[in-house]
Amino acid sequence: MYAVVKTGGKQYRVAAGEKLKVEQIPADIGQEITLDQVLSVGEGDQLKVGTPLVAGAVVKATVLAHGRHDKVKIFKMRRRKHYQKRQGHRQNYTEIRIEAITA
Protein backbone atom coordinates (compact mmCIF):
# COMPACT_ATOMS: atom_id res chain seq x y z
CA MET A 1 0.00 0.00 0.00
CA TYR A 2 1.23 3.49 -0.81
CA ALA A 3 -0.02 7.03 -0.36
CA VAL A 4 0.72 10.50 -1.66
CA VAL A 5 0.98 12.97 1.22
CA LYS A 6 1.48 16.72 1.29
CA THR A 7 3.78 18.25 3.89
CA GLY A 8 5.89 21.38 3.86
CA GLY A 9 4.43 22.49 0.52
CA LYS A 10 5.68 19.37 -1.29
CA GLN A 11 4.11 16.04 -2.22
CA TYR A 12 5.71 12.68 -1.46
CA ARG A 13 4.82 9.13 -2.51
CA VAL A 14 5.32 7.01 0.61
CA ALA A 15 4.97 3.38 1.67
CA ALA A 16 5.22 1.73 5.08
CA GLY A 17 8.81 1.35 6.28
CA GLU A 18 10.28 4.05 4.03
CA LYS A 19 12.58 6.79 5.32
CA LEU A 20 12.48 10.25 3.80
CA LYS A 21 13.62 13.81 4.44
CA VAL A 22 10.86 16.41 4.55
CA GLU A 23 10.78 20.11 5.36
CA GLN A 24 11.39 20.79 9.04
CA ILE A 25 8.59 19.67 11.37
CA PRO A 26 8.54 21.00 14.96
CA ALA A 27 8.58 17.64 16.78
CA ASP A 28 10.97 15.83 19.10
CA ILE A 29 13.14 12.90 18.00
CA GLY A 30 11.28 9.64 18.57
CA GLN A 31 7.89 11.34 18.60
CA GLU A 32 5.12 9.87 16.43
CA ILE A 33 3.46 12.33 14.07
CA THR A 34 0.42 12.05 11.82
CA LEU A 35 0.33 13.32 8.26
CA ASP A 36 -3.36 13.93 7.58
CA GLN A 37 -3.11 15.66 4.21
CA VAL A 38 -3.37 12.46 2.14
CA LEU A 39 -4.01 13.21 -1.54
CA SER A 40 -4.33 9.62 -2.79
CA VAL A 41 -4.06 6.04 -1.57
CA GLY A 42 -3.29 3.02 -3.74
CA GLU A 43 -2.92 -0.71 -3.33
CA GLY A 44 -2.25 -3.00 -6.26
CA ASP A 45 -4.44 -1.90 -9.18
CA GLN A 46 -6.81 0.16 -7.04
CA LEU A 47 -6.29 3.88 -6.57
CA LYS A 48 -8.39 6.23 -4.46
CA VAL A 49 -7.89 9.90 -5.30
CA GLY A 50 -9.21 12.57 -2.96
CA THR A 51 -10.97 15.79 -3.89
CA PRO A 52 -8.65 17.30 -2.69
CA LEU A 53 -8.01 14.95 0.30
CA VAL A 54 -8.97 11.31 0.94
CA ALA A 55 -11.52 11.30 3.76
CA GLY A 56 -10.37 9.41 6.85
CA ALA A 57 -6.91 8.59 5.49
CA VAL A 58 -3.97 9.09 7.86
CA VAL A 59 -0.25 8.33 7.57
CA LYS A 60 1.62 7.75 10.83
CA ALA A 61 5.35 8.44 10.96
CA THR A 62 8.15 8.60 13.53
CA VAL A 63 10.71 11.42 13.69
CA LEU A 64 14.22 9.97 13.36
CA ALA A 65 16.45 13.06 13.17
CA HIS A 66 16.72 16.75 12.41
CA GLY A 67 19.47 18.15 10.21
CA ARG A 68 20.54 20.52 7.48
CA HIS A 69 21.00 19.82 3.79
CA ASP A 70 24.24 20.51 1.94
CA LYS A 71 25.03 24.13 1.17
CA VAL A 72 23.64 25.57 -2.04
CA LYS A 73 25.86 28.33 -3.44
CA ILE A 74 24.23 31.34 -5.07
CA PHE A 75 26.39 33.56 -7.28
CA LYS A 76 25.05 36.69 -8.95
CA MET A 77 27.07 38.76 -11.36
CA ARG A 78 26.58 41.66 -13.74
CA ARG A 79 29.05 41.58 -16.56
CA ARG A 80 31.31 44.57 -17.15
CA LYS A 81 30.03 46.35 -14.00
CA HIS A 82 32.31 44.71 -11.44
CA TYR A 83 29.31 43.50 -9.45
CA GLN A 84 29.52 40.09 -7.84
CA LYS A 85 27.48 38.71 -4.99
CA ARG A 86 28.02 35.38 -3.29
CA GLN A 87 25.53 33.80 -0.94
CA GLY A 88 24.97 30.37 0.57
CA HIS A 89 21.90 28.60 1.92
CA ARG A 90 21.33 25.45 3.99
CA GLN A 91 17.76 24.22 4.36
CA ASN A 92 16.63 22.49 7.56
CA TYR A 93 14.97 19.08 7.27
CA THR A 94 13.36 16.39 9.40
CA GLU A 95 14.02 12.72 8.65
CA ILE A 96 10.97 10.52 9.23
CA ARG A 97 10.09 6.83 8.91
CA ILE A 98 6.61 5.89 7.71
CA GLU A 99 5.04 3.46 10.18
CA ALA A 100 1.51 2.87 8.90
CA ILE A 101 -0.99 3.99 6.28
CA THR A 102 -4.68 3.79 7.14
CA ALA A 103 -7.40 4.59 4.63
From Swiss-Prot:
One of its GO terms (cellular component) is ribonucleoprotein complex. GO terms for biological process: translation. It comes from the Bacteria. GO terms for molecular function: rRNA binding; structural constituent of ribosome. InterPro entries: bL21-like, bL21-like_sf, Ribosomal_bL21, Ribosomal_bL21_CS. SUPFAM superfamilies: L21p-like. Keywords: Ribonucleoprotein, Ribosomal protein, RNA-binding, rRNA-binding. Pfam families: Ribosomal_L21p. Signal peptide: none annotated. NCBIfam families: L21. Part of the 50S ribosomal subunit. Contacts protein L20. This protein binds to 23S rRNA in the presence of protein L20. Belongs to the bacterial ribosomal protein bL21 family. This is Large ribosomal subunit protein bL21. It comes from Bordetella avium (strain 197N). The gene is rplU.
